[in-house]
Amino acid sequence: MAVSSTTLSSPTPPECLQQQEAPRPPATRGRLVVLTGPSGVGKGTLVSQLRQRHPELYFSVSVTTRPPRPGEQEGVNYYFRTREEFLNLIEADELLEWAQYAGNFYGTPREIVFQKLSQGQDVLLEIELAGARQVRQQCPDAIRIFLSPPSLEELERRIRERGQDSEASIQRRLQQARKELDAKDEFDYVIVNDNLEQALQELEALLYPPSPGKGQS
């Protein structure tokens, strides 16, 4: 089955950027930020709040074979594709990274990411652990952040509170979460999401540190 490449076509990617923490002039490359954490830890909510405060940050919309949840929109939350279409994207090398999670495939369209970076725009990827490891191989200068729950028990409570998963699915997610938590030391930064506002402030401090001398008389 042919897959439309209107939004997912992929040229040969340029080299990855050098990590920079200070504000950059428009002519320089943007930063690639990778956010990873267990399902239910609050990545989506945190990203939504961050984007409201920093609309200049480009959020890369992932491709998935997961069925849309109520309220989700094509091209806004995800690009929804069949399994066959997704495999075609892999074969065509149109994905920067991809991984299988809870029986579904997830991946990041390659072209738009490098396009935004080359234009000097920061790009945020909210992806799974396996995908984050792939990005590390291709873009070692990416800023890698792990969002952790305060405890596994709290994570289970949040997943159950969503009311979207069967018991079998909850157990699979918790099993995967244990593996992901064991890998958090692979990341540059770890933020514990015990309080959303505090986690957001920590994330902002990492990505948008105050300019030297700001606030001083």
UniProtKB/Swiss-Prot annotation:
Domain Guanylate kinase-like per the UniProt entry, residue ranges: 30-208
Catalytic activity: GMP + ATP = GDP + ADP; dZMP + ATP = dZDP + ADP
Residue spans crossing the bilayer: none
Region Disordered: start-end pairs: 1-30
Pfam families with a match to the protein in the record: Guanylate_kin
Entry EC number(s): 2.7.4.8
Entry-linked PROSITE patterns: GUANYLATE_KINASE_1 (PS00856), GUANYLATE_KINASE_2 (PS50052)
Localization, UniProt: Cytoplasm
Superkingdom in the source lineage: Bacteria
Cellular component annotations (GO), alphabetically ordered: cytosol
Gene3D superfamilies listed in its UniProt record: Guanylate Kinase phosphate binding domain, P-loop containing nucleotide triphosphate hydrolases
ATP-binding keyword on record: yes
GO molecular function (one): guanylate kinase activity
Binding of ATP, residues: 37-44
Primary enzyme class: transferase
Stored InterPro entries: GK/Ca_channel_bsu, Guanylate_kin-like_dom, Guanylate_kinase, Guanylate_kinase_CS, P-loop_NTPase
Low complexity composition-biased segments: 1-10
SMART domains per the UniProt record, alphabetical: GuKc
Main localisation: cytoplasm
Keywords: ATP-binding, Cytoplasm, Kinase, Nucleotide-binding, Transferase
Metabolic or biological pathway, per its Swiss-Prot or TrEMBL entry: Purine metabolism
Family according to the record: Belongs to the guanylate kinase family.
PANTHER family listed in its UniProt record: GUANYLATE KINASE, GUANYLATE KINASE-RELATED
Function in brief: Essential for recycling GMP and indirectly, cGMP. (Microbial infection) Catalyzes the phosphorylation of dZMP to dZDP, when the bacterium is infected by a phage that produces the substrate for the synthesis of dZTP (2- amino-2'-deoxyadenosine 5'-triphosphate), which is then used by the phage as a DNA polymerase substrate.
Name of the protein described by the UniProt record: Guanylate kinase
Annotated organism of origin: Synechococcus sp. (strain JA-3-3Ab)
